[in-house]
């Protein structure tokens, strides 16, 4: 049997880029909670002892941006300079302007257009992907890397591994076989974890705790064998982390946010963007379409692309590829997709309830992936039953 290796990485919520994603989405939540028509394009950057929030926001909401920044940093665990950032004492800069009136008139007519008339907030192309290799209909390499990162945070916050600090990265290499276009995981080839830690812990203790409390609870035993390679803090020392170790910026972890390198990506980031930004809403609807195709038995693996022009409601193109795993021709599946999904931005906002903020709704998406999550707030993960007739043998 011919096999190949494929690798996906993740970072946890204390990584400086992910910190920025979470602040941007916390701002979005605050705006949408008070004003569902808020137009938000919120960027965040961070470095030692500094967080800056900047962008274009038009909203009736009363938002305390500095409080959102400090609360988000504190909740992640950035509570002192020792761990990379002190939420209560760092410098917070806010540079927010209104949305460009040129964009406003072209996209939503200064809030006068009906939902079906609202145009895309920008040009672009987005991809959705699904595969039957996991219950989440997501790639196993990505699922495992993401869950390892989430588990790192869990054992840090519950005190199981008190030596952990907020920043950390994970990476998983899976050996696969190709079953006529479908991906079949065989085993985990390599597990890599680099996690920030305090001064007191030894490398041996780090390796032992990571295997016992992070890897074993996350990776099913059937995928591990005596040949699985473990690289656990291979650099030997990771005390300085968070914004103290590296600068952070919103939108720099777009592959981690999506499919771990599988499928494709149009390049647009998600966090800090309201649903008129099709970078986000378009990617959500095509994930729902791809997932529904696989869940309905139309294919074992699928990618869906949609594209837009700024100010134009209807998509320019919709594309489906099932990698040869489709039960009926891809052109027939494309027809089913177009009949069942409304790709107009205003209608996507309604059908996926994307104007509802608050309660950490979008903040939750900003760490540990936007897809494959079992959470009712992730409305794009709800499978739409697709009716089709199996061809006669």
Swiss-Prot record:
Primary residence: cytoplasm
Q: Which reaction does it catalyse?
A: L-methionine + ATP + H2O = S-adenosyl-L-methionine + phosphate + diphosphate
InterPro entries, per the entry: ADOMET_SYNTHASE_CS, S-AdoMet_synt_C, S-AdoMet_synt_central, S-AdoMet_synt_N, S-AdoMet_synthetase, S-AdoMet_synthetase_sfam
Keywords attached to this Swiss-Prot or TrEMBL record, sorted alphabetically, are: ATP-binding, Cobalt, Cytoplasm, Magnesium, Metal-binding, Nucleotide-binding, One-carbon metabolism, Potassium, Transferase
Binding residue positions for ATP: 15, 167-169, 235-238, 246, 252-253, 269, 273, 277
In which residues is L-methionine bound?
56, 99, 246, 277
**Protein's cellular compartments:** Cytoplasm
A molecular function (GO) held by this record is:
ATP binding
What cofactor is this protein dependent on?
A: Mn(2+); Mg(2+); Co(2+); K(+)
Q: Quote the cofactor binding remark.
A: Binds 2 divalent ions per subunit. The metal ions interact primarily with the substrate. Can utilize magnesium, manganese or cobalt (in vitro).
Could you give the subunit structure recorded for this chain?
Answer: Homotetramer.
> What's the protein here called?
S-adenosylmethionine synthase 1
